[in-house]
UniProtKB/Swiss-Prot annotation:
Belongs to the eukaryotic ribosomal protein eL24 family. GO terms for molecular function: mRNA binding; structural constituent of ribosome. The lineage of its organism: Eukaryota, Metazoa, Ecdysozoa, Nematoda, Chromadorea. Keywords: Ribonucleoprotein, Ribosomal protein. Residues 137-147 have a biased composition (Polar residues). Coiled coil: none annotated. GO terms for cellular component: cytosolic large ribosomal subunit. SUPFAM superfamilies: Glucocorticoid receptor-like (DNA-binding domain). Residues 118-159 are annotated as: Disordered. It holds the Pfam family Ribosomal_L24e. This is Large ribosomal subunit protein eL24.
């Protein structure tokens, strides 16, 4: 025996009961009663309707309120494990974590300086290559543009 759940009220629906609504996107919604179906069609939020399960959970009514309280009490304890990660030893990780801001800033500046120097060297090499290219190529004469006759402008409109 397959017991469904109402998408609106949250109550169980036994075989032979309930109404099915097939939406245009192909999803099937099962409602406990016409009352639940009407509430859904009127776009009423089930959390605000007093007889739905969602309302009872939200406002901690009856057995639903007791379930929530017992759930909150149980918490899983998290174990902290110190170990090497991604090819770094534990000592290396701790050393990185304990670095001062000044040391990190100096490292950043040094890395930026090295990158800038490398860029300057590449630019200088390109500039030298361009100068050699220009010197080896003979200057070509510029071609003059031909005057192309265009149609006279149309005065007035189409009609």
């Amino acid at each position: 025996m397959k017991v469904e759940t109402c998408v609106y009220s949250g109550y169980k629906i036994h075989p032979g009961h309930g109404k099915r609504l097939v939406r245009t996107d192909g999803k099937v919604q099962i409602f406990l009663s016409g009352k639940a179906l009407k509430g859904a069609k009127l776009r009423r939020n089930p959390r605000d309707i007093r007889w739905t399960v969602l309302y009872r959970i939200k406002n901690k009514k009856g057995t639903h309120g007791q379930e929530q309280v017992t759930r909150k009490k149980t918490k899983k304890s998290v174990q902290v494990v110190n170990r090497a990660v991604a090819g770094l030893s534990l000592d290396a990780i701790l050393a990185k974590r304990n670095q001062t801001e000044d040391f990190r800033r100096q490292q950043r500046e040094q890395a930026a300086k090295i990158a800038k120097d490398a860029n300057k060297a590449v630019r200088a090499a390109k500039a030298a290559a361009n100068k050699e290219k220009k010197a080896s190529q003979p200057k070509t004469q510029q071609k003059t543009a031909k005057n192309v006759k265009t149609a006279a402008p149309r005065v007035g409109g189409k009609r």
